[in-house]
């Protein structure tokens, strides 16, 4: 029985992880649940899974949760604040940590799990986007096992040779016969929408993804393809890939989740219905396989598989992310922080859809280049970039 901590249990990935646990109750025990402010849902999760610990970042929410659990007669220890979350992520009894807190808020808890040498199921993009080198170095030092949960990175991982899977972050792609990492993306809900209509896109339209069930922030990132930009940055770090070893393809059906091209002409792809329980189950059971509750792919119902070259005029955020990686860790950190603020402003009807990339670009251009050597540098840039982004938003 493996003990599992879920960082972000009330989010989309967290709920899918619990669904996989439901299908394999004899293999996994939920040791701790970690959430933000959704007291109602995490109360229900505590009733069902009865973890030993539950932690909320918000102290008032934690106090309310404690009342709820006491009223239900549940003897679950309720913790509050970041320090408690770090301690749960690195608890000596824990076997694996699902790192699924969205945004920069998930950075330090995930790092805590890595430094403790845990099996880390990495669903938090920002960990690598903001401090990729630090994460890879810490994982090598502690012996932590990094397993990518993002459907694209998980697909790449599955399509790589076993030697590469054992060297996440430092695998020698060329020596293993790999010529290209091919990152696929659906293109989002506006793949064919006329560009002159982009400024009228509403938050409700942007969060309605055609293939995947995701949270609001990630859905908007998919619509702007910032999601793919962040995944490009992640892939560069996870698979030790150069710019020349990366390729991005728009694949609207989201059936092929990513591919690896080899020097002998072979292309190995991972396919399946678009359901996050597949990569989650893969990382939880690796190197074995477990039932995920996902319907098998029916090839006879597939009408077509199409592939389109990315159009940077349609997806300027994707271009910005690629350029930011070339600039360095400070630029990707600043861009990520700006994007979180810009997407929130868009969802609150403060700026237009087309303004998101303008905020991101302005912040990246106005943050002075600095060398990122430690987490404190990352947190400083992140804070500064958020302040600059908020100032730019006031001008719209």
UniProtKB/Swiss-Prot annotation:
One annotated GO molecular function: NADPH binding
Pathway connected to this protein: Isoprenoid biosynthesis; isopentenyl diphosphate biosynthesis via DXP pathway; isopentenyl diphosphate from 1-deoxy-D-xylulose 5-phosphate: step 1/6
Catalytic activity reported: 2-C-methyl-D-erythritol 4-phosphate + NADP(+) = 1-deoxy-D-xylulose 5-phosphate + NADPH + H(+)
Domain of life: Bacteria
EC number(s) given by UniProt: 1.1.1.267
Binding residues annotated for Mn(2+), in chain numbering: 150, 152, 231
Key word Glycosyltransferase present: no
Cofactor requirements of the protein: Mg(2+); Mn(2+)
Binding locations of NADPH: 10-13, 36-38, 124, 126, 215
Top enzyme category: oxidoreductase
Listed Gene3D superfamilies: 1.10.1740.10, NAD(P)-binding Rossmann-like Domain
Biological function: Catalyzes the NADPH-dependent rearrangement and reduction of 1-deoxy-D-xylulose-5-phosphate (DXP) to 2-C-methyl-D-erythritol 4-phosphate (MEP).
Family under the similarity heading: Belongs to the DXR family.
Protein name: 1-deoxy-D-xylulose 5-phosphate reductoisomerase
Gene source species: Glaesserella parasuis serovar 5 (strain SH0165) (Haemophilus parasuis)
Gene designation per UniProt: dxr
């Amino acid at each position: 029985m493996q003990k599992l901590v879920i960082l972000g249990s009330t989010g989309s990935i967290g709920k899918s992880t619990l669904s996989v646990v439901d299908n394999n109750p004899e293999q996994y025990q939920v040791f701790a649940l970690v959430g933000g402010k959704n007291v109602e849902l995490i109360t229900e999760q505590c009733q069902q899974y009865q973890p030993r610990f539950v932690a909320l970042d918000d102290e008032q929410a934690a106090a309310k949760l404690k009342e709820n659990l006491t009223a239900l007669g549940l003897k679950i220890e309720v913790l509050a604040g970041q320090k408690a979350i770090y301690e749960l992520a690195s608890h000596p009894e824990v076997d694996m940590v699902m790192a699924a807190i969205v945004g920069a808020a998930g950075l330090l808890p995930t790092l805590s799990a890595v430094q403790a040498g845990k099996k880390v199921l990495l669903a938090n993009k920002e960990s690598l986007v903001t401090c990729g080198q630090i994460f890879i170095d810490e994982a090598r030092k502690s012996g932590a096992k990094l397993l990518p949960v993002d459907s694209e990175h998980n697909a790449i991982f599955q399509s790589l040779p076993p030697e590469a899977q054992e060297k996440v972050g430092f695998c020698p792609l060329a020596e293993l016969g790999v010529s290209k990492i091919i990152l696929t993306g659906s293109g989002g809900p506006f793949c064919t929408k006329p560009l002159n209509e982009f400024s009228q896109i509403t938050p409700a339209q942007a969060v309605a993804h055609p293939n995947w069930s995701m949270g609001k922030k990630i859905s908007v990132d998919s619509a702007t393809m910032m999601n793919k930009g962040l995944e490009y940055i992640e892939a560069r770090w996870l698979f030790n890939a150069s710019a020349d070893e990366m390729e991005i393809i728009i694949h609207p059906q989201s059936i092929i989740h990513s591919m690896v091209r080899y020097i002998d002409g072979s292309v190995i792809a991972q396919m399946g219905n678009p359901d996050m329980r597949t990569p989650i189950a893969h990382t939880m059971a690796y190197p074995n396989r477990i039932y995920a509750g996902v319907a098998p792919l029916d090839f006879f119902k597939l009408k077509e598989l199409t592939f389109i070259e990315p159009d940077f005029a349609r997806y300027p955020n994707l271009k910005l992310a690629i350029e930011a990686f070339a600039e360095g860790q400070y630029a990707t950190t600043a861009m990520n922080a700006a994007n979180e603020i810009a997407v929130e402003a868009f969802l609150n009807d403060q700026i237009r859809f087309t303004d998101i990339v303008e905020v991101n670009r302005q912040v990246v251009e106005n943050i002075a280049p600095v060398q990122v050597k430690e987490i404190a540098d990352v947190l400083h840039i992140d804070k500064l970039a958020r302040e600059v982004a908020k100032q730019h938003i006031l001008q719209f």
